[in-house]
Each structure stands twice: as C-alpha cells, then as structure tokens.
Amino acid sequence: MSEAANSLLLERAGLPEDLRWLAQKYPRENWQGHTNIHGLANMWLQRHDMFRELGGMLTNGIGDYREGRLTAPDFARWFAPRLNHFLGHLDGHHNVEDYQYFPAFAKAEPRLQRGFEILDADHHTIHEGLERNAEAANAFIRTLEESEDRQRFAADAYADENSRLIAMLKRHLADEEDLIIPLILDRGDRALVADDD
C-alpha cells in the first residue's frame, strides 16, 4: 500500500452513500435495542471497543512518558506487553474478517461487495501501519538506555506513528460497523453464517 492509500483512509468521512442503505434502515442509535444485536453483532462491537480502548491506552501511555509522569524503565515494562497485545489481536482479528466473515457477508448481500473490498483494502493499509508502529515502538524501546534527547526524539516518532494508526483505525472501525452491524441486524447472524455453507 502506498501513502495514497493511507491518505484515502485518513481522509474518508465515512462509507460512500450507495453502501449506507442498511445503515440508514438501522441507525446506530437504535442498534442496542434490536433483537439481533446479541451474538455476532454484540461480539463485533465489543471487539472494536477493545481496540479503541487499547489504542487510547497506548496514546495516553506515550503521553505520560513524554510529559515525565513515567520513567523510561516503568514505561517500557508497561508499554511492551500492551503494544504486543494490541498489534497481535488487531492483526488476527483482521485475518478472521478477511478470510471468514467478509466473504460470507458479501455472499449473503452482493450489493455490499464493494464495501467489503474497501474494508479489505483498509486492512492492508492498517497492517502496514501496524508494521510501522511496531518498528517505531521498537526503535523507541531501544533508546531507553541511551541519552534523554534520543529517547525524546524516538518517543515523538512513535507518537506520530501511533496517532496515524489510531486515526486510521477509528475511521475503519466506524465504517466497518456501519456496513456489518446493520447487515447482521437485518438478517440475523445465524442466517449469515448459514449462507456461507
């Protein structure tokens, strides 16, 4: 993926209108009251909330370090396991979506195929962002035994990379929910899984 793909994801204001017909039928503010919210839809939303929460924790953690509220050793002990959890689970989640759920959902509702292609392209862009994030984080962690100036420079570089990743992720998660949750509400998760057989 290129910087252009990065930019498209970051600049997108939401799904194209022609893919929002189910989202208009099932507005976000009504999801929790729908009978089909349990099961797959609820799991999807909880998983996405977890990614938002972990992303926020990483952003706040690097902010705490940069503001001097955490020492370098304390930050490293706190940061590394959370970053690994975030990156690993996000990548695994995207793989399950790309190879299991998206094909089943596109088969169940072919009019949304282009939406799943957009989400798949997002996953590739986000995966590259994950790799850049991990590289910047590792570079930062390596500087924790070096001069304070090098630590600050590396922390700033990581914070910039993290900000880009979190911005892409927020846009993608919202668009994915706007495409998938209304489909699940409309059809029910059992019908969607059964369509994959």
Features from the language model and the residues they span:
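Small-residue-biased structural context
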Residues: 1-197
